[in-house]
Curated annotation (Swiss-Prot):
InterPro entries in the record: Dehydroquinate_synthase (IPR050071), DHQ_synth_AroB (IPR016037), DHQ_synth_fam (IPR030963), DHQS/DOIS_N (IPR030960), DHQS_C (IPR056179)
Organism: Corynebacterium glutamicum (strain R)
Pathway: Metabolic intermediate biosynthesis; chorismate biosynthesis; chorismate from D-erythrose 4-phosphate and phosphoenolpyruvate: step 2/7
Protein name: 3-dehydroquinate synthase
EC number: 4.2.3.4
Residue numbers binding NAD(+): 75-80, 109-113, 133-134, 146, 155
Molecular function via GO: 3-dehydroquinate synthase activity; metal ion binding; nucleotide binding
Lineage, highest ranks first: Bacteria, Bacillati, Actinomycetota, Actinomycetes, Mycobacteriales
Amino acid sequence: MSAAQIFNTVHVNGSSPYDVHIGSGLNELIVQRAAESGAEQVAILHQPSMDDIASELDAALVAAGLKVLHLNVPDAENGKSLEVAGQCWDELGGAAFGRRDIVIGLGGGAATDLAGFVAAAWMRGVRVIQVPTTLLAMVDAAVGGKTGINTAAGKNLVGAFHEPDAVFIDTERLATLPDAEIIAGSAEIIKTGFIADPEILRLYETDPAACLKKEVEGSHLPELIWRSVTVKGSVVGQDLKESSLREILNYGHTFAHAVELRENFRWRHGNAVAVGMMFIANLSHKLGLIDAPLLERHRSILAAIGLPTSYEGGAFDELYDGMTRDKKNRDGNIRFVALTAVGEVTRIEGPSKQDLQSAYEAISH
């Protein structure tokens, strides 16, 4: 293993505080954390694409005197099902996995979501260390304590709030990712820029290529990851269970989740969020909440790095049905997180179906 180097640490407050470590060569620190925890066993939950990384981590954990169990799950959103979670619990039971033991979620957002849910439910809650390997998971899924699985009714409708013991973001993993994964993950970073950190937007506007550069030297990605995690950590530290403030992290997500449901989760989450931000920006402009320059700023920033800014036409009824199922809805009203300016967040409650259709048509192709 290469020597560990930490660039930044974000401390997340709350009922169970934890640290998010951002750096390179972090396997050594992951092993140290597990070895000092009092655990006898570590279960690494990972997808086939992570087999090599999991094997490397396995060897280091065994060398530190820990027993290692592998929970192999299907790639992508296919693994986030009750059936797969049940198989994981069966394996934990067969290994006599105890309350002091630790689950490690290794992989993209689907793996970290599932690992958190498996850990939250096993013995009413065992510790989980999140090791995200995609940009999306680094800035979104692995931070914040939300866990969940998908059902036929929608995405992440079954889950639990379960804060991780620690999160380790290794920027060396970025170089292994396809360009499309970097682009899609950037949508969640841009989202945090619009809701809370204008410097994120400035970086994308002044040098979009550096914001996508996977090799750390000369890349803005380490700073963008740190800034995005800082925003999310501050929010969830004040409101873990999304009773008020945490809702702002759902900017663009109401429409995005409807798109994902319609696409049977085949769309990358970040791409759906990009289109979702364009939808809510258009709705906000129509309702007089934002001006035309801010609407155009959404489009230009997203388009500059290759994110989609439109969605296919003729699908409004299906998308409307998806939006009516959103978890943020209250009293039968569809609710949206919206902006009045960069860093100034508000809510739109129960907009008319006609206004929603108009916003949809503005982004249809």
